[in-house]
Amino acid sequence: MAKKSSIEREKKRSELTQKYSNLRKSLKEMIHQASSLEEKWSIQRQLQRLPRNSAATRVHRRCFVTGRPRAVYRDFGLSRHVIREMAHACLLPGVIKASW
């Protein structure tokens, strides 16, 4: 089980990402449309003034059950350990054990 502080930190990052996503997107479009170099620099400074944790690249996926940051499957939002346990307990509909 992950520390509660790290799980809360990730939640805070995802909230900041959602809050600033439109502003960040519009500033990036303005940079691409800017004609002069000074104009691009001023827009870039505005972009740099935004909180670091508002960038989407800083958000890391975590398992919903355990909070584990590694081996998290996007389809389920669960780590491989939890998927295995839940699949064996028939708690994931449509998931079957592979055999060939």
Curated annotation (Swiss-Prot):
Keyword Endoplasmic reticulum: no
Keyword Endoplasmic reticulum found: no
Stored InterPro entries: Ribosomal_uS14 (IPR001209), Ribosomal_uS14_bac/plastid (IPR023036), Ribosomal_uS14_CS (IPR018271)
GO cellular component: chloroplast; small ribosomal subunit
PROSITE patterns with a match to the protein in the record: RIBOSOMAL_S14
Keywords: Chloroplast, Plastid, Ribonucleoprotein, Ribosomal protein, RNA-binding, rRNA-binding
Record's function text: Binds 16S rRNA, required for the assembly of 30S particles.
NCBIfam families: PRK08881.1
Protein name: Small ribosomal subunit protein uS14c
Organism: Zygnema circumcarinatum (Green alga)
